[in-house]
């Protein structure tokens, strides 16, 4: 295996050029070291909050992509942690870098057969657009290493809205990736997962600050993401958050689930402390309120009203060789096909035949 990356020892881990040909660039502040491992992978709280939409939820469009990762053994022991950042100069997504053939993860697993599980924590769900092919690379990676499982947690869905030109490709690719369940898990970051990311990857956060409660705006966004990914893939995320207010309604399935699952460590009397100098978004007071939450299997929650029926059976596509489509065809994906005249003719003839039969019966009756 001839690697395409270069790795250098740093003070608290390693720094990696995902492609040997990358160099320092004025167009990208992270070039050329887009992958960092160990304690070098930590980022500032300010950067994390801006990119991941924490703790209030996403308040403005985010162009940067950041993915934290953990490599673990079958027993759950941590082998390595790190992060990959997008390259704005060459327009490369972090998932594309990590899962490149002969890339960093390919080499890591090839040289360490104890790695059995990869966990990603990304600000965006992976895409499969032509310039990136992130999901295709993940799919091929999993075929190459059949003993590896992959869990993907994200803070927002990326380019899956129907009015985006490439959304059809992204949604279809997410369905294909989700069809590999239980080897692959696609789920929004929620609840205690936020605390885990803060503890493992964010610098300057420690003690009780790590476990402060998730605010309502963020919790609602996470729950919305859970139902959206379910609508797209047909596979339910295993866990999602339930707000404490749900407990006031004793007639819901969520109430039963609340009583069955213990509360996580949270501090309902505190707000999440933002970095000094960073302004809080102008949100309604209820979206800034702290939330005591429980993690409940999504199957135990009452359904939400959505455009698509999440219980509708789906045909899972297990390949990613998608046909080429023109831009105009992509725009027309949401349009309903026009009716066929043959159907109208059949209905007209049916109606006419029935009318003639009735007239004949009337004439016979007169005779």
Curated annotation (Swiss-Prot):
Alphabetically ordered keywords of this record: Hydrolase, Metal-binding, mRNA processing, Zinc
Coiled coil regions, renumbered to chain: none
Protein residues bound to Zn(2+): 93, 127, 134
Ranges where the CMP/dCMP-type deaminase domain occurs: 61-177
Listed GO MF terms: hydrolase activity; metal ion binding
A Pfam family hit: NAD1
Tissue: Predominantly expressed in testis.
Catalytic residues identified in the record: 95
UniProt GO BP: mRNA processing
Entry EC number(s): 3.5.4.-
Domain of life: Eukaryota
Family, as annotated: Belongs to the cytidine and deoxycytidylate deaminase family.
Function: Putative C to U editing enzyme whose physiological substrate is not yet known.
The name this protein goes by in its record: Putative C->U-editing enzyme APOBEC-4
Organism: Homo sapiens
Lineage of the organism: Eukaryota, Metazoa, Chordata, Craniata, Vertebrata
